[in-house]
């Protein structure tokens, strides 16, 4: 009798993706982040589901309902802390996953890469609307500031902002629709993840050498299934440690104050994982220019495959491009730091220099380094 695992229409799909999948034998720990992101998504959907059972999306009760979850619901404090800090881990894994893609030239698989960039945007949207739900000071003012950016759109800007708000300011209608968006978006993300995997399995995984690995493949199970489980254990341990020992480390103290439209916090800033983009937004004195720079800071990833000039796929054997990659990493960290600082000297100028460098690296320096390395390869 034929093996059910290989013949059943549904189980066969799972088998081809998780058991008999041919994987390059040399993929390193940097290839663990895809499965870790899957784990993050499942964790967030489950904890979010239990939070949604007790949360009320009304401005008069939203803040109290979050307090009620933490005080009165069985293990509500744990579910809430896991959900809030799970978002941080989601973004850490996502940024590392993107960095891996940039370093090892995984953007050569254009469909997989572009769906990945769309996924990044979807998750950022989900996190933004989710941050508004507790209805604390930073929730309210963050929502006000970021949604207000849409007023920079020529001609239709003001109408667009009022349409999203459902009125003339961030109010009850805004909170209700943001809760609806926050509930539906993770399922759209899950659908996009399936597409992401579908396109990935058309080509197979890249590997650290950037060479064709058809001659040296191993089964996904048991080799990489166990490797992924090790990653799961490490990440869950880190997440649980953060959620139990220092759950508010990455949050903003302002959000412990209920939203008040009459009192503006001294420093309005988003969660830490958006600070680099926020720094780019703030470094341009013009509103529309800032919004475009903010958008392009993520969308620039879409044109990375077009700007690939090197004869080699990965940076493994390209020291100049490697140096520029690490400059980009340092630049992102500087932008993250600047995004959390007040708008005053010397932070303004540092942010502007870091923003210019960010785009120059992507659009000019890294492609030029690729051309230079090609030249050096052809030297006799």
From Swiss-Prot:
Record Gene3D superfamilies: Cytochrome Bc1 Complex, Chain C (1.20.810.10)
* Residues that coordinate or bind heme b b562: 83, 182
Q: Where are the transmembrane segments?
A: 33-53, 77-98, 113-133, 178-198, 226-246, 288-308, 320-340, 347-367
What does the cofactor section's free text say about binding?
A: Binds 2 heme b groups non-covalently.
Q: Which domain of life is it from?
A: Eukaryota
One GO CC term of this entry? Answer: mitochondrial inner membrane
Q: What subcellular locations does the record give?
A: Mitochondrion inner membrane
Q: Which residues bind a ubiquinone?
A: 201
Q: Which PROSITE patterns match?
A: CYTB_CTER (PS51003), CYTB_NTER (PS51002)
What does this protein need as cofactor? heme b
Q: What InterPro entries does the annotation carry?
A: Cyt_b/b6_C, Cyt_b/b6_C_sf, Cyt_b/b6_N, Cytb/b6-like_sf, Cytochrome_b, Cytochrome_b_C_euk/bac, Cytochrome_b_N_euk/bac, Di-haem_cyt_TM
Q: Its principal location?
A: mitochondrion
Residues involved in heme b b566 binding? 97, 196
GO BP annotations, alphabetical order: mitochondrial electron transport, ubiquinol to cytochrome c
- Function of the molecule: Component of the ubiquinol-cytochrome c reductase complex (complex III or cytochrome b-c1 complex) that is part of the mitochondrial respiratory chain. The b-c1 complex mediates electron transfer from ubiquinol to cytochrome c. Contributes to the generation of a proton gradient across the mitochondrial membrane that is then used for ATP synthesis.
As for family, the record states: Belongs to the cytochrome b family.
Q: What is this protein called?
A: Cytochrome b
Q: Which organism is it from?
A: Arapaima gigas (Arapaima)
């Amino acid at each position: 009798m034929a093996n059910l695992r290989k013949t059943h229409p549904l189980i066969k799909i799972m088998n081809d993706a998780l058991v008999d999948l041919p994987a390059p034998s040399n993929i390193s720990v940097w290839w663990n982040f895809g499965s870790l992101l899957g784990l993050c998504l499942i964790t967030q959907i489950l904890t979010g589901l239990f939070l949604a059972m007790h949360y009320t999306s009304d401005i008069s009760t939203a803040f109290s309902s979050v307090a009620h979850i933490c005080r009165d619901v069985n293990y509500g404090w744990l579910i809430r802390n896991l959900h809030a800090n799970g978002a941080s881990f989601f973004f850490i894994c996502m940024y590392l996953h993107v960095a891996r893609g940039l370093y090892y030239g995984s953007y050569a698989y254009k469909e997989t890469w572009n769906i990945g960039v769309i996924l990044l945007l979807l998750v950022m949207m989900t996190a933004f609307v989710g941050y508004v739900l507790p209805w604390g000071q930073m929730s309210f003012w963050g929502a006000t500031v970021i949604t207000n950016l849409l007023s920079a759109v020529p001609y239709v800007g003001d109408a667009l902002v009022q349409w999203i708000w459902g009125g003339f300011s961030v109010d009850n209608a805004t909170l209700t629709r943001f809760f609806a968006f926050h509930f539906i978006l993770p399922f759209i993300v899950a659908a996009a993840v399936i597409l992401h995997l579908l396109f990935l399995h058309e080509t197979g995984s890249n590997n650290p050498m950037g060479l064709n690995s058809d001659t040296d493949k191993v089964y996904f199970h048991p080799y990489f299934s166990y490797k992924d489980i090790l990653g799961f254990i490490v990440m869950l341990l880190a997440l649980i440690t953060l959620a139990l020992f220092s759950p508010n480390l990455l949050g903003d103290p302002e959000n412990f104050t209920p939203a008040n439209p009459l009192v503006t916090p001294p420093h309005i800033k988003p969660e830490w994982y958006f600070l680099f983009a926020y720094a780019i937004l703030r470094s341009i004195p013009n509103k529309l220019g800032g919004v475009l720079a903010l958008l392009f800071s993520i969308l620039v990833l879409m044109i990375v495959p077009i700007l690939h000039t090197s004869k080699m796929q990965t940076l493994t054997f390209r020291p100049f491009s490697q140096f520029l990659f690490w400059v980009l990493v340092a630049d992102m960290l500087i932008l993250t730091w600047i995004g959390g600082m007040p708008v005053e000297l010397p932070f303004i100028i540092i942010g502007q220099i870091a923003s210019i460098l960010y785009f120059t690296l992507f659009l000019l320096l890294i492609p030029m380094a690729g051309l230079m390395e090609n030249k050096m390869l052809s030297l006799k």
